[in-house]
Amino acid sequence: MRLLITGISGNIGNELSKKLEKEEIDFLGLDIVNNKMNSKKIISNDITKLKNLLKEKKLKKIDTLIHLASKINNEKDVTKIGLESIDVNIKGTINLLNSLPNLKNILFASSYMVYGIPLQNPIKENHKLEPQNIYGISKVITEKYLQVFCKEKKIELTIFRFMGIYGFSENYTSQAIPIFINKIKNNEKPTIFGDGNQKRNHLYVDDAIDAIITWLKNTKAGIFNIGGANTPTNLELISLINKKMNKKVQPIFVKQEQHDFIADISNMKKILKFTPKIKIKDGINKTVEKF
């Protein structure tokens, strides 16, 4: 197996690379950002530049791809977000596929955002795809392109639709849990949209990495929801964070319709043979210690 991981310098890619090195699994990383890893294992390149990718001789031998590279943009300018998402998430993926002539297996990191507003809970993989933001739209388009491409090229495709992944340090604050932690740490009231009773099976980063490793050791094609073991409410999250920090910061409630978002992870358990280990309380405690 000759493995390539895109987005190797990102939060998930960085943690994955550490685990792979620990388990002595050989890999090649690709990222636009230079990091401090062994330079022999990293290709510094931009997936939006096909000509540059085609010059990379090491890519010709790759037969297994873990595609983590993605653009998550918090810009308020919808046009700018759209252009960047198309450029990186969609065009970048197409360029990547065109520069890897010997692919046999692909694992694509997608997102729960492809579903949009749940029609029912728990959400199965065959749920209608109606994303409510540009990031989700770009993931749906990329999924569909990969399905057509892989069918034509006879490549085994696996799609992981990750629930919100938490457990990173404070520089990663686009998810509810790190936002809540930052607020409570600074004695600021976190904002809760709705009544705070909405449930979601957040996924701790170590479990996300272990799910990828499990796939790597025994590849299974298909689409899988990858979510955590528990389904806490936002109020429960804030309570756990307060307890760990020995604080009593109360939230601000903003009236807004909210929905439970609970992924059905039965296929993950039955077919992938993977079960998340980190309970929400332990995950929150570990995350707080990183801030």
Residue ranges and their predicted role:
Residues 3-23:
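N-terminal Rossmann NAD(P)H-binding glycine-rich loop of SDR-like oxidoreductase domains
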Residues 6, 30, 65-71, 106-112, ...:
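SDR active-site strand-loop-helix element
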Residues 47-88:
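NAD(P)H-binding glycine-rich loop region in Rossmannoid oxidoreductase-like domains
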Residues 67, 94-134:
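Conserved Rossmann-fold NAD(P)-dependent oxidoreductase catalytic core, especially the SDR/UDP-sugar
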Residues 110-111, 143-168:
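Conserved beta-loop-beta element that borders a ligand/cofactor-binding pocket
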Residues 115-116, 130-134, 158-175:
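Flexible, glycine-rich beta-alpha linker
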Residues 138-141:
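Active-site helix of classical SDR
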Residues 184, 188-291:
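C-terminal substrate-binding subdomain of Rossmann-fold SDR/epimerase-dehydratase oxidoreductases
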